[in-house]
Amino acid sequence: MEAKPRVKVVLLDIEGTVCPISFVKDVLFPYALAALPETLSTEWDSSSFLPYRSAFPPEHSSTPEALLSHVRDLMAQDLKIPYLKSLQGYLWLRGYESGTLKCPLFPDVYPAMKKWKENGAKICIYSSGSVAAQKLLWRYTAEGDLRGCIWNGVDGAEEIEGGYWDTVNAGLKQESTSYEKIAKANRALGEVGEWLFLSDNVKEVRAAKESGMKSFVVVREGNADVSVEEKNRQVLITSFREVEAMVEVTGESA
């Protein structure tokens, strides 16, 4: 019997892959919009808020009203602008800390992550949400604080924190060069062909495969439909439990 391909590193998307799209669209985004007016009113000149305000273009950060209007426009268009993502993470912090926000993971996610880590594999995250927002989400899940499951090594040569990636430190998720950069920064963990990227987005899966990574499309309730053409081209899974039917997820220490 032919041995299954080996995977040393699993790279995970978040929205639609480990948690429902509805948590982001219907819970996190509305929370940020609702919290923003009071934050602008009470923290406009505060040292903690200034870095987020200063990241916005001058024409949109001259007054609280201008910034609020710009944020509403960006979110209405679902644009993934880095300075917007950073601000959202700042706004979500209090919601997570107060217990108002808690990320509901799909039931197969944590057991799979736990098993992969126990087998010596490494787990990394790549999302359009900022690294700060990613860390909040994994800290405050319905399963508890799962940051310990995620690789937190630092590549000394490039001074990049290896476990969390977004569109700022990696690049756009539909470009193969972004996946090449992630694998190169963590080259001690395994060759690019020993990485597996899991995402609900077919275009991201294509880009990851172009870089040399393995990649599967994750099909979840509430996700966009996958075309018949792509179903014939891609490997589709409906649960992380299906991953090890196709690859062996294990690290050097296993």
From Swiss-Prot:
GO molecular function, one term: acireductone synthase activity
Alphabetical list of Gene3D superfamilies matching this protein: 1.10.720.60, HAD superfamily/HAD-like
Keywords: Amino-acid biosynthesis, Cytoplasm, Hydrolase, Magnesium, Metal-binding, Methionine biosynthesis, Nucleus
Cofactor: Mg(2+)
Catalytic activity: 5-methylsulfanyl-2,3-dioxopentyl phosphate + H2O = 1,2-dihydroxy-5-(methylsulfanyl)pent-1-en-3-one + phosphate
Origin superkingdom: Eukaryota
Main location (coarse class): cytoplasm
Matches recorded under InterPro entries: Enolase-ppase_E1 (IPR023943), ENOPH1_eukaryotes (IPR027511), HAD-like_sf (IPR036412), HAD_sf (IPR023214)
GO biological process, one term: L-methionine salvage from methylthioadenosine
Stored SUPFAM superfamilies: HAD-like (SSF56784)
GO cellular component terms attached to this protein's record: cytoplasm; nucleus
Positions bound to Mg(2+): 13, 15, 200
EC code: 3.1.3.77
Location relative to the cell: Cytoplasm; Nucleus
EC class name: hydrolase
Pfam families according to UniProt: Hydrolase
Signal peptide coordinates: none
Pathway as given in its UniProt record: Amino-acid biosynthesis; L-methionine biosynthesis via salvage pathway; L-methionine from S-methyl-5-thio-alpha-D-ribose 1-phosphate: step 3/6; Amino-acid biosynthesis; L-methionine biosynthesis via salvage pathway; L-methionine from S-methyl-5-thio-alpha-D-ribose 1-phosphate: step 4/6
Protein residues bound to substrate: 127-128, 173
Role played: Bifunctional enzyme that catalyzes the enolization of 2,3-diketo-5-methylthiopentyl-1-phosphate (DK-MTP-1-P) into the intermediate 2-hydroxy-3-keto-5-methylthiopentenyl-1-phosphate (HK-MTPenyl-1-P), which is then dephosphorylated to form the acireductone 1,2-dihydroxy-3-keto-5-methylthiopentene (DHK-MTPene).
Family: Belongs to the HAD-like hydrolase superfamily. MasA/MtnC family.
Subunit structure: Monomer.
Descriptive protein name: Enolase-phosphatase E1
Higher taxonomy: Eukaryota, Fungi, Dikarya, Ascomycota, Pezizomycotina
